Each structure stands twice: as structure tokens, then as C-alpha cells.
Amino acid sequence: MPFRLTVFCALLLVASQAAALTIYKYTDANGVVTYTDQATAGAQVFVFRDRMVERLDNQVKLETQKHAAGDTLLVRNDLYAPVQIELTLEQVDNAIGVPSKPITWVLPPRSKIRLATLTARDASKPLRYTPKLRYAMGDPRLLPTQQSYPLPWRGGPFRLTQGANGQYSHFTPKGRYAMDIAMPEGTPIVAARGGMVVKTENQQSGRGTNPSGNYVRILHDDGTMGVYLHLMQGSVSVREGQRINSGSPIARSGNTGNSTGPHLHFVVQRNVGLALESIPFDFAQPVNSLPNFAVGGE
């Protein structure tokens, strides 16, 4: 069979919509790996990890400028995308200028703003506070304008192995409406929509440390983002800060990260208020699903 993922997907049974499936990984004497929903001797539970793990703490930073009058708090956004932030000050003591409620703002790409300046009420005593910064990529004020997407690959036809509300792994807010499409490693992946490349990962091999594997995130003009996951190591051909058109080559499909077989995981997300969530979309062309596979509930 051409794809191990095909074997895995065909063995899944339809469960209740709210329940997640338990998947087992079995390696036989010849080293052949099989995924199944049956607990056979020697099989191990396949542990699902959230596919979308993106560290932004090196690109969205809270900075403190100390001066004779006190402290000035600034936030810097080094991303090529807007970022919504929320700053809360806790355990405050001997401070003037503390906001009465959390400060929220949407920082433009590649920008820095001042959020607050604090001074000591009693200059002979230290100024004390604990800042808590929350943030999420994207501008929640923007609304989606497109739901139908061209196929983000060349070749095929390929088959859908897990769709919206799929019970294996499409049950988190970030991935509920994602699509998994089985395809050979090295299949050309293209941008379903044009926009700005805002995040990439290109160096991961195998399962690695990031469940997303290698990926590309593209910000569209309506604030939504298309994300392409589990890409082949070294195949990402776009860079952060590059504007691309619909249909532009971006990478080749792979089997990296939290992947059970060669496939593309494609999801559209938007910031819904300090959190990224997936949103419904359709492919502009029909994509058949594998037989006997739970592609999700309504």
C-alpha cells in the first residue's frame, strides 16, 4: 500500500462526535509500523500532541526602560503580522500610574509602543509590580471574506484522511476545521491564498520536538491565516516577510512532527480575541475521503 497513513485511516471507526479516538502504534518484527484502534499485544498508545506549537516569546517582548522617575513599559512586535496584546500588572506596591484595568492593544507588524509609565509613590522605597503579558498573532477586528480555497498542492488526485471535527486530532480550537490530505512525500505545496509569510519552520526531521513539524504560516489580507504543516525538511522555499501570490510554490509535503504518515495538514485560522482558532472553509474542487474514515461530525 503506498501510504502507511492509508492503512491507519482505514482502520478508524466512527465514534460519537464528542469523543476522541484512542490510536495504537504497532511495530512488527520487520520494522513495519501500523496504526490501529485495536489494542494488540506489543502496541503502544499513540500520544496526540497539539499540532500548533509556535513560540513567539523571542518576537513579541515586554521591555522595561528604567529611569530616574520610574519604569516605562513597552511592547515590541518583531513579527511580520499584527499582534494583539494584553498587559496586566499584579502584586503592585508603591506605584503611581498603574492602569485600573488590563491594557489591550493591537500592534502593527514590526513595531513598538509604550504601554505605561510607573513612578514610585514614596521615592525612598522600591517600586514593585509583576507584569503579565498575553498575546496572540493577528487582528481580531478583521473578519473573513473568503471561504472557498483552491487546492494547496499540485498533482493527485489525493484523498482526505481527516476533516472538520475529526475525532482523532481535530477537536481543539486551533484545529477543529483542519483538513488532512494523504499524499506522497515531496508533493509540491502551493499557497491557497496570497499574502504575507509570517512564520516558517524548515529544519525539523522526523517527529522532532515540535508537533507541527516544518510549516508555513501565511497572513491573508482579511486577517485570516493559512497554515501548512508536516512539510519536508529543507523544502520550505519562502521566507518570513515575503509577500506571495495564490498558487506560488511554498514547500513540499512531508511526514514531520506529530504525523502518522505522509500528508498535508492545512488549516485556516484567525484571532478571535487573544487566541487563534480555526475557522470553516471549503476546497473549490471536490476532494474524496478514504473509505470507512470518520471525517468528522456536522
Model-derived features with residue positions:
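Active-site region of chymotrypsin-like
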Residues: 176, 213-240
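Acidic, glycine-rich catalytic/binding loops that coordinate metals and/or anionic ligands
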Residues: 145-164, 170, 174, 185, ...
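Surface-exposed, glycine-biased beta-strand/turn segments
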Residues: 104-212
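Bacterial N-terminal signal peptides
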Residues: 6-15
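Short hydrophobic beta/alpha edge segments that flank linear recognition/processing sites
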Residues: 215-216, 244-257
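Short, cationic interaction patches enriched in Lys/Arg with P/S/T/G and frequent prolines
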Residues: 17-119, 124-128
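Active-site loop architecture of trypsin-fold serine endopeptidases
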Residues: 204-211, 253-265
